[in-house]
Amino acid sequence: MKKIIALLLALVMVLGLVACGAEKPAETKAPETQAPAAQNPEVTEAPAPMDVTLKVWAPSEDQNPELGEWLITMCNQFNEMHPEWNITFEYGVCTESDAKKLVPQDMEAAADVFLYSSTNLEVLTSSNALAEFGGTYLETVQNNYPQSMVDCVIYDGGVYGVPMTTNTYFMYYDKSVFTEEDVKSLDVMLEKGKVAFPLANGFYNAAFYLANGATFFGEDGTDREAGIQLGGEKGTAVTHALIDYVANPNFIVAEPADAIAMMREGNCDAYVCGTWQAAQTQEILGENFGVAMLPCATIDGQSMQLRPFTSAKCIGVKSTTQYPEVALKLALWLGGYESQKAHYELRGYIPCELKLMSEVQDDIVCRIDAQTITEIAVPRYSFAEFSFFWTPAESMGLEIRDGVVTHENAAEKTEAFNQACNNSGI
C-alpha cells in the first residue's frame, strides 16, 4: 500500500511539472522606441542669381533679324544655361577691324566682350585692352582649335582670345558661264563673262602684288624690320597689269556687297569675297553655284597665282571688365561648338572648332576655304605697322580705277605707294 501511495504522489508531481511547462511564456516585446523627433533643419534657399550687365559688340550683320540675330540668339542661350547669373546684355555695333580703335580709346565705355581681327592683336594688347586667358580657359582654347588658329590669338607668349572663324577669300562664279578650267585664269574668265574685283580695298588688291613677290614683314611675315616691300620692278609690273585689267570692260571694280547685287541682277558672273556671302550667292545661282580659289593673272607676260591674305576673326574680353568669369565664359561659348555651328548655318562662317570642322567637309565653301589657306594664302600677322598699308592701298586702287595711275607714271606711283605703306603718315 505504501508503494502505491508513493507512485501516486510521484505521478502527481510529474503532471504538475508538465502542466507548468505548457504554460504560455510571457511575451518579450521589443522595447518601445519613441519615434525620433522630426529633423527640421533650416531650409537653405538657393542663392539669388547675381545681377550682371555685359556689353557685347559685334558687326551689325550678326545682330540683323533677317540674318538670324546670331549674337543675340547665342547670348540668350548662354543666359539660360547659367541660372546663377541674371545677365542683362547691352549690344553695340562694332566691326572686327574697328575694335582696335574703339576699345582702347574709352575702356570704361567699351564692350566687355567683343569681336576683333587677329591682325589687330598687337594694338589691343599693347594698350592693355585684352584680358589674357589662363587656367581652364586657356586649356579650352589650346585643346579645341587648330594650332594655326591658336597662333592667331597669341602675342608675346600669352593667349588673348578665342578663334571664331578663318578670314580669307576666294571666288564665287556662275557655272553656266565658266567651267572649272576657266576659273583658273582671270584672262580666260574675262573673255567669257564679267568679273567683279574690289580693287579699292587693300585686303583684296594686295593679292596681285603678293602674286609677284611682294612681302609683308619678310618672307614669313614675322620680320618687323623688313617692312612692306611691294615696289621696284616687280611692283611696277603689277601696277601695269592692273591698269590693263581695269581697261577691260568685263573687269568690274566693286566691293562684295555691290557685286552680289549686280549678280542678282544678271550684271556680274563672278566676284571675289569670303565666306560671309556664300548663302546669298548660292540662293542667286542655285545649281550653277560655283566656288574656286583665286585665279591666275597675267603679270609681266607670265601667269601668276593671285594670293589672298588670311587671318582669323576672334572673340576678346576687355581687361578691365567688372565680371571676368562671366565674360571669359561667354567668349568661350561664342567661339565654341554650338555658336560656331549656328554662325555657319546662319551666315556661312567657316568653323575653326576642331570637332565641327570635321563635320563640314562636304561643304564646297569649307573645302575651298581650307584649300586656299593651305595652298596659296599669305598669313597676316599683328604688327601695328600693318595698319599703315590700308589707306595707301585704297588710294592706289581708286587711282588705278579712275585712270590717275597710268602706264606712263606707274613706276613713280608704285614707289610712292610703297613708301606710304611704310609710313604712319604722321
Question: What is each model feature region?
Answer:
Residues 6, 20-120, 298, 419-426:
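Conserved N-terminal structural module of periplasmic/extracytoplasmic solute-binding proteins
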Residues 46, 118-170, 181, 292-293, ...:
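Hinge/lid segment of periplasmic solute-binding proteins
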Residues 57-59, 114, 246-323:
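Extracytoplasmic/periplasmic substrate-binding proteins
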Residues 77, 81-144, 160-161, 269-270, ...:
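Extracytoplasmic "Venus flytrap"/periplasmic binding protein-like
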Residues 104, 109-112, 139-173, 194-198, ...:
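A structural signal for short loop-to-beta-strand junctions that line the ligand-binding cleft
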Residues 160-164, 169, 187-228, 268:
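Extracytoplasmic/periplasmic solute-binding protein
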Residues 224-255:
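Glycine-centered hinge/linker elements that transmit conformational signals in sensory
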Residues 347-352, 366-423:
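C-terminal capping/gating helix-and-loop segments adjacent to ligand/active sites or protein-protein/ligand interfaces
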